[in-house]
From Swiss-Prot:
Changing residue 278 to N: In chs3-r2; suppression of the chs3-1 phenotype. Residues 1238-1297 form the LIM zinc-binding domain. PANTHER family: PROTEIN DA1-RELATED 2, PROTEIN DA1-RELATED 4-RELATED. This is Protein DA1-related 4. InterPro entries: Apaf_helical, DA1-like, DA1-like_dom, Leu-rich_rpt_3, LRR_dom_sf, NB-ARC, P-loop_NTPase, TIR_dom. GO terms for biological process: defense response; response to cold; signal transduction. Disulfide bonds: none annotated. The gene is DAR4. Residues 1072-1085 have a biased composition (Low complexity). Changing residue 201 to D: In chs3-r1; suppression of the chs3-1 phenotype. LRR repeats lie at residues 448-473, 516-540, 569-592, 594-615, 617-637, 638-661, 662-682, 683-703, 723-747, 748-770, 771-791, 792-816, 822-847, 888-911.
Length: 1613
């Protein structure tokens, strides 16, 4: 039994082998480390955190040969910016870490927030390399920018991989991906299929998902090898033994009812079940099995693993997760662990390891098996791997043979052909060949892809190396029916001419006989063989369909000779590919009728033959570089041909008319130097290559698809007269093309013209009329000096490497211009009307600084204009690359490094349209543009109100690979983009407004990989651009930035006499300003007012950020304006005198400087006159006048300075004194404007944000100036000297409170003001409400407020709405809590082995059970309300089986009860808990009663009642303390028992408590601590005192109580 209290998530027993220790500084405990700890615990990893710092951590005292705390395997060391790396203690700490590593522990270093590279890299690199450690770095140190969440995920993945064995490598990342897929599904019965090739890890992943998620479901079942189990046991038996066992064990339903689950649907409709069917191949079996599971409740999950994607379609699986092979890092780790026993191989073994990884394509099973096969063979590893490739290990063969045996005969034939011959060929080509072989490949290939036998990549057919080698091995096992040949030795046996055979003798037969009639395919590589072929070699090969003879090493060498010629070729040939065919003709009787592809490059053919009836099957003809070929007239019979390649056939004199070939797409006649005429163009031609021909004329034609034409030679432009529909013309590398005449009227549809590297091209016609031209390539035309004009719709222009000096007016449509290496280019003319824009002027050194400035300014102006157009779909963008000019450095306001910080003020947020970013990139001599260049920009928006920072990332494409081949010296990239600005939806929320933005710039490749030291960012600068900006030049933007800063500073200086500025409404603020101030502010409206008058809207109610003038380079005029405004507002203040003196000094000094500047100008003119007149006398006069003027000026300056300070001193002629005094005057002015920072009286920290409250003789932060009653901040307009630091309502409540219940003033009596106040909730109410029937919550003991909703339970107890939200209403709902508390006991090393039920009952049933239990009521126990009881006797209990959760106003909630007979199997028969209490309170009562059960089960029945109840109260209090920890409240109660809670060795479930639940925990603890009863209150305090005095755990204290139970002191206790 126990008194009132509450609950929390239980701890889980720590597994020392899977635990982690974290050492960190206290500053990162509540940021990175808290998130890291939570993430590790979610993965079932126990975590202990030591936040004492690296220097004072308790681990520092552990000896090097001792294990870590709790036997943890992994130590995470978080190194933050507070660590002093050069202190003497740090090397000692590293030695300790080395000792832990030597002892078998794993150290994971994490560098977090370290902002100085020089502080870390020196020693860190040497340490990491020496210890072979892999570190994790935050975004400050890493080139790859990581957010905190990404860093945590990376660390957890690393730790997870180090804790678990090798077979779980790579599992964690795949678990996360599956979880993301499941979260996207609806809350109905969810399903997911895990698909992949054999050995890829489907079963391992499914088991990991099952183990990870099974605890979240009411029941779970994993059926391994489903097909085998189904066919062995049958449907009914499988359901009964696997699913029926769930019904029996979890829901107490007989397994015989599995075929009739509808009989118990009322019990099962809300049960969440997890079922995994592994390795499903028979889709019908799986479908019939799943049909019986339609009774699963919402939220259930079905997982199926299979190599066949069609299974998922049959079983109606919602989503499919494709298991990919391990990445390089994971595969290297797994293979290294398997073969070497370490996580990463040594450098000498890395090359072979990468070969194995590439071969198996990251297959985990193959990596493990190959690793074991190669273990211990280090010296012969290369040879062993070569043998394994040709004969895969039996285990791999067995796995893959199962997949092969499940295929149909047709599918097997296709697989074998692809494995031997067609891997890597295009899909259409393979289908054409196989269709003619009657294999029906169109459907079969899709089926094979679904079964993971084939893959389609970039329109080519691919096959895994393991499957390919296994298929070849399978085929070798069926040698008696050999149909495919690829081994040179066996092919040589069939084809070779032998003199023995000619003389009548027989050759020696190979071990396995070969039958020519059975052969269907021959693929011979002649690179390693050379022999003579007999003339009738192919005579009996009637079924030969594919013949390919090639040399993989050289295309020009043939290893075959035909001493007697070749008589015949098989009639059934579909593919004839013969490189370097040595004969002049094909056999005379050879029929081309079945050929699909004829490929004979580098052959000696003269012609193709004469016996040609029909070439309807021929699709491809390739006779390239056949130098002896003179005619190919047979092409006119190939009506379905698609490709003709006769490249390099220099002897070919004519090409037949192909105008009737409807399917012909590609014709390549390049290099056919003797062809003069092209008589007919195919109607559907797509590519026509005519380079190197003598063609002078092309006939008129109308192409259905405009072709891509490649031409060359002088004035070939005229050949295109009849190409009215041509879209692409390629004249690349035509070195003898000098001029191009104008035929624009016939090129109306030309889209792309490529004339790159036409090195002799000197002139181009005016191309203005080519309205369809979009892309023009002129790069590398080194002699081209002038271009007449460009088409108006041109989008991309490449003129790099030309001799152009001036570009004409560029079209407005132009989006991309590459002028790399235009060394003579001086000017450019372009309007920025179309965005985005991208211009490359790298290595263009003739541009003047004025041209650069004007060009950049035009881009920014256009960008601003386009940014205002909301209908613009694509965000405006400008990217300009130009060489860095030192004269322009000041214009871009650059600073060293790759980081730039930009300060913002609140009213600037809405009108910001983007940023102008200037990035200087230094290119070294070894830089070559092989991978492209991008600039990665990461903008971190520092937000108000402690909101998380917003990170906006953007990649700016500078140039693609080879676009700027070689870049030298420094170049500046000017970038503008609106995407760096957050979305409007975020801006409009006040909590998301930022006060500053930090930009980081990195150089990356086109694939976003970091580039090396040859290309790096050295300087950068960022300027804010607003939509209301008037002057958009670079200098104008800088001036506007300064003006904004001045205005902002003025607003922070202004001080009102009565009401603080920040507490006023905008209207009041405006009225309070002086007319001169309003006039000044209104005059700057064009620059600082935003849309909707944002400035005036927020100036009076949003805190402005102070700016330190010392940290900014201000002009003297800026200081004067600030001082003038300050003086206008402070005329009535006493310190105005000093400010006036400083202002007068500043103004007079300015006048002197201006006079000096005028004198200098005058003197310059006079010196020029003297130079021409050579009048020495005037020079002497001028010298004297200058000296007198200098002395006069010195006297005036000194006089003014001395007068400003109120002192008189002797004049000092030293110029250093003059500068020092002027500097002192400026500093004096700045100190007046920027007084020293004050400190808050409450938190003692400096007040840096410019907002403070000056009250009661002290200065406070606004959030620290709080009411003494409610501890909430007090607004400035609520401050009153009369009531002190109280809110007005709080002060009234303190002096004359209202009744919480009736909301009326508590009446005064003759004895004064009397009221009752709850000791914890601090709610005051009239004394009369204690007896007038006002509802009182049975849980939190609060009286109910009038008019509020409340609930009366069936046993007439009241429950408030807050407690009702988390109330546990029936016995089933209490079971998860029961299991959690059992785990909590286990974490205390007090595991309860025996099982007993826990029932929730009504109050009457609890009282009845108490009487039958015959509990001896003593003392105050009679007065206690019984809310829980631990039974030891058999009896019938009426439990609540169903409670109603509706919120009804003043109505009784009914329940459904059922009788349960508790049977005595041990010392405890059952535990009864009062139903309808909140989960927290129910958990506390259950923990209390389970402590009673523990005592009885362990034979402690005769303990003193006070000590027994005290032990139970302490246990309940510890459980509540655990809840306090999980809820992450501000502080943990200092009770001695709390320090012994098993927080460090347990893992609690994730909860999201409300504020009321957090307060309810503290209420329950308060009730325990303040209980005055002899049993519960005194017992708690006595046991707690014993634990504190001896520093014992609860279990040790129990042993101590037992040990003294026989002494005389025991009775006194």
């Amino acid at each position: 039994m126990e008194p009132p209290a509450a609950r929390v998530t239980p701890s889980i027993k720590a597994d020392c082998s899977h635990s982690v220790n974290i050492i960190c500084e206290e500053t990162v405990l509540h940021s990175l480390v808290s998130h890291l700890s939570a993430a590790l615990r979610r993965e079932g990893i126990s975590v202990f955190v030591d936040a004492c710092g690296l220097q004072e951590t308790k681990f520092f005292s552990i000896k090097q040969n001792q294990p870590l705390t709790d036997g943890a395997r992994v130590l995470v060391v978080v190194i933050s910016d507070e660590v002093e790396f050069y202190d003497p203690w740090f090397p000692k700490f590293l030695k300790v870490i080395q000792g832990w590593q030597n002892n078998g522990h794993v150290v994971v270093p994490v560098f977090y927030g370290v902002d100085s590279l020089t502080r870390v890299y020196g020693w860190a690199n040497s340490w990491l390399e020496a210890e072979k450690l892999t570190s994790h770095q935050s975004k400050i140190l890493s080139n790859n920018v990581l957010t905190d969440s990404e860093l945590v995920e990376e660390i957890v993945r690393d730790v997870y991989g180090k804790l678990y064995p090798a077979e779980r490598v790579g599992i964690y990342a795949r678990l996360l991906e599956i979880e993301k897929l499941l979260y996207k599904q609806h809350r109905d019965i969810r399903s997911i299929g895990i698909w992949g090739m054999p050995g890829i890890g489907k079963t391992t992943l499914a088991k990991a998902v099952f183990n990870h998620m099974s605890t979240d479901y009411d029941a779970s079942c994993f059926i391994e090898n489903f097909d085998e189990a189904f066919h062995k046991e049958g449907l009914h038996r499988l359901l009964k033994e696997r699913i029926g066992k769930i019904l029996k064990d979890e829901f107490d339903i007989e397994s015989s009812y599995i075929m009739r689950p509808t009989l118990h649907r009322d019990k099962l409709y809300d049960k969440r079940i997890l079922v995994v069917l592994d390795d499903v191949r028979d889709s019908l079996a799986a479908e019939s099995f799943l049909k019986r599971l339609d009774w699963f409740g919402s939220g259930s999950l079905i997982i199926i693993t299979s190599v066949d994607k069609q299974v998922f379609a049959f079983c109606q699986i919602n989503q499919i997760y494709t298991v990919q092979g391990l990445n390089v890092h994971e595969a290297l780790q797994l293979f290294s662990q398997s073969v070497f026993g370490i996580n990463e191989p040594e450098q000498n073994d890395r090359k072979l390891s990468m070969k194995v990884i590439d071969y198996v394509n990251g297959n985990p099973l193959a990596l493990s098996i190959y690793g074991r096969e190669l273990m211990g063979k280090k010296s012969e590893m290369e040879t062993a791997f070569f043998e394994l490739k040709h004969c895969p290990p039996l285990k791999i063969q067995d796995v893959l043979k199962n997949a092969y045996s499940a295929l149909s005969d047709n599918e097997k034939n296709i697989v074998l052909d692809i494995a031997f011959f067609f891997k890597g060929e295009t899909v259409n080509y393979v289908m054409q060949l196989l269709e003619e072989s009657h294999y029906f490949p169109r459907l079969a290939i899709d089926v094979l892809v679904d079964k993971c036998v084939l893959t389609i990549s970039e329109n080519t057919v691919q096959m895994n190396n393991l499957i390919q080698d296994t298929c070849q091995e399978i085929f070798n096992g069926e040698i008696e029916t050999c149909t495919r040949m690829w081994e040179p030795s066996r092919i040589r046996y069939l084809l070779e001419y032998d003199e023995l055979e000619g003389s009548g003798e027989t050759k020696a037969m190979p071990k396995s006989g070969l039958v020519a009639e059975h052969i269907e395919s021959i693929f011979l590589d002649t690179s390693n063989v050379k022999f003579d072929v007999k003339h009738d070699a192919f005579k009996n090969m009637f079924n030969l369909k594919f013949l390919k003879i090639y040399n993989s090493c050289s295309k020009y060498i043939s290893g075959l000779n035909f001493p007697k010629g070749l008589d015949s070729l098989p009639y059934e040939l579909r593919l004839l590919h013969w490189e370097n065919y040595p004969l002049q003709s094909l056999p005379q009787d050879f029929d081309f009728g079945h050929l699909v592809k004829l490929s004979m490059p580098y052959s000696q053919l003269h012609k193709l033959g004469t016996r040609v009836k029909d070439l309807v099957m021929l699709k491809r003809l390739i006779l390239s570089h056949s130098l002896q070929l003179v005619e190919c007239d047979i092409l006119i019979y190939a009506q379905n041909i698609e490709l003709i390649d006769l490249q390099g056939c220099t002897g070919l004199q004519r090409f037949p008319d192909t105008s009737q070939l409807q399917n012909l797409r590609v014709v390549n006649l390049s290099g056919c130097t003797e062809i003069k005429c092209f008589s007919g163009v195919p109607p559907n031609i797509e590519e026509l290559h005519l380079q190197g021909t003598r063609i002078r004329e092309i006939p008129i034609f109308n192409a259905t698809h405009p072709p891509k034409v490649k031409l060359d030679r002088k004035k070939l432009w005229n050949l295109l007269e009849n190409f009215s529909d041509v879209e692409h013309i390629d004249l690349e590398c035509v070195t003898n093309l000098a001029t191009v005449t104008s035929n624009n009227h016939v090129m109306g549809k030309l889209v792309c013209l490529n004339m790159k590297y036409c090195s002799n091209l000197r002139g181009l016609p005016d191309m203005v009329s080519l309205e369809s031209l979009k892309v023009l390539y002129l790069s590398g035309c080194s002699e081209l000096e002038k271009i007449m004009g460009f088409p108006r719709n041109l989008k991309k222009l490449y003129v790099g490497g030309t001799a152009i000096r001036e570009l004409p007016q560029l079209p407005n449509s132009l989006e991309f211009l590459n002028a790399h290496g235009c060394k003579h280019l001086k000017s450019i003319n372009l309007d920025f009307e179309q965005l985005p824009r991208h211009f490359i002027f790298s290595n263009c050194y003739r541009f003047s600084s004025q041209v650069i400035a004007e060009f950049v300014e035009k881009g920014l102006v256009a960008s601003l204009a386009r940014a205002k157009q909301e209908e613009l779909i694509k965000a405006p963008e400008v990217i300009i690359c130009i060489p860095m000019d030192t004269r322009q450095r000041s214009s871009f306001r650059l600073q060293a490094g790759r980081n730039a910080m930009t300060d913002l003020v609140p009213w600037m947020q809405k009108p910001i349209s983007g940023f102008s970013m200037s990035v200087v990139v230094s290119f070294q001599d070894d830089y070559h543009n092989d991978v492209g260049l991008r600039i990665r920009c990461v903008g971190t928006w520092k937000t108000w109100n402690n909101q998380p920072d917003r990170i906006v990332e953007r990649f700016f494409q500078c140039w693609a690979p080879t676009e700027a081949p070689k870049v030298v010296a420094d170049h500046i990239f000017v970038l503008y983009d609106t995407k760096m600005h957050p979305s409007d939806s975020e801006e409009n929320h006040i909590s998301m407004w930022a006060h500053e933005v930090k930009f980081e710039f990195h150089t990356v490749s086109g694939e976003n990989n970091p580039l090396g030291a040859s290309c790096k960012v050295t300087e950068c600068g960022v300027e804010v651009i607003t939509a209301a900006t008037g002057d958009t030049s670079v200098s104008g933007i800088i001036r506007e930035s300064e003006t904004i800063t001045i205005i902002e500073k003025e607003d922070t200086i202004i001080d009102e006499e009565d009401t603080p500025l920040l507490s006023r409404k905008p209207e009041e603020t405006n009225r309070s300003r002086s007319s001169s101030e309003l006039q000044k502010l209104s005059s700057t409206s064009s620059k600082v007012r935003s849309k909707g008058n944002v400035f005036w809207k927020w100036l009076g109610c949003f805190p402005l950020q102070p700016k330190n003038l010392r940290s900014r380079s201000r002009r003297t005029t800026a200081l004067e304006e600030a001082l003038e405004e300050a003086l206008k507002e402070r005329e009535k203040l006493e310190d105005t005198r000093e400010l006036q003196i400083a202002l007068i000094e500043s103004k007079k000094i300015k006048k002197i400087k201006q006079a000096d500047e005028r004198d200098q100008i005058k003197h310059a003119d006079e010196r020029e006159q003297r130079k021409h007149s050579k009048d020495h006398e005037e020079e002497e006069i001028e010298s004297n006048e200058k000296e007198e003027r200098r002395h006069s000026k010195d006297y005036v300056i000194e006089e003014l300075v001395l007068k400003g300070k109120g002192k008189r001193k002797q004049l000092d002629d030293d110029k250093a004194d003059e500068k020092e005094q002027i500097k002192h005057s400026k500093d004096h002015v700045e100190e007046e404007v920027n007084p020293p920072l004050s400190k808050c009286k409450d938190c003692k920290s400096a007040i840096e944000d410019g907002i403070s409250i000056n009250a009661y003789g002290s200065v406070w932060h606004p959030q620290c100036f709080c009411c003494l009653r409610c501890r909430e901040p007090i607004a400035m307009n609520e401050i009153s000297d009369l009531r002190g630091m109280y809110h007005k309502p709080c002060y009234k409540e303190l002096r004359h409170p209202n009744c919480y219940v009736c909301e009326k003033k508590i009446p005064r009596t003759a004895e004064g003001l009397k009221y009752h106040e709850h000791p914890f909730w601090m709610e005051t109410y009239c004394p009369s409400h204690d007896g007038d029937g006002t509802p009182k919550c049975c849980s939190c003991e609060r009286l109910e407020h009038c008019g509020t909703q409340y609930v009366m339970l069936a046993d007439f107890r009241w429950l408030c709405r807050e407690c009702m939200d988390s109330a546990i209403m029936d016995s089933d709902e209490c079971q998860p809590l029961h299991f959690e508390i059992r785990e909590f006991f286990e974490g205390l090393h007090m595991k309860i082995e025996e099982e007993f039920p826990v029932y929730l009952v009504e109050k009457n049933a609890l009282n009845k059970a108490e009487k039958e239990e015959k509990i001896d009521k003593q003392g105050d126990q009679c007065l206690m309300v019984v809310r829980g009881i631990c039974l030891s006797e058999e009896q019938i209990v009426t439990s609540v089986s169903q409670g109603v959760r509706r919120m009804l106003n003043k109505q009784i909630l009914d329940t459904v009860t059922e009788s349960q007979r508790v049977v005595r199997k041990c010392e405890v028969t059952a535990i009864l808990i009062l139903y309808g209490l909140p989960r927290l309170l129910t958990g506390y009562i259950l923990a209390h009663e389970m402590m009673h059960a523990y005592l009885r089960l362990n034979g402690y029945r005769n303990l003193n009642m006070v000590l027994e109840e005290g032990l139970c109260q302490v246990l309940g209090y510890m459980w509540l303390e655990c809840q306090t920890y999980v809820f992450d409240t501000a502080t943990i109660a200092s009770s001695s028992s709390s320090s012994r809670t098993p927080l460090s060795t347990t893992t609690s479930k994730k909860v999201d408590p409300s504020d009321f639940e957090k307060r309810l925990v503290n209420f329950c603890k308060h009730q325990i601590e303040t209980d005055e009863s002899p049993f519960f209150g005194d017992g708690f305090r006595k046991v707690n005192k014993m634990m504190a005095s001896n520093n014992h755990s609860l279990k040790d204290t129990l042993k101590e109580i037992i040990s003294i139970s026989k002494t005389p002191q025991y009775s006194k206790l």
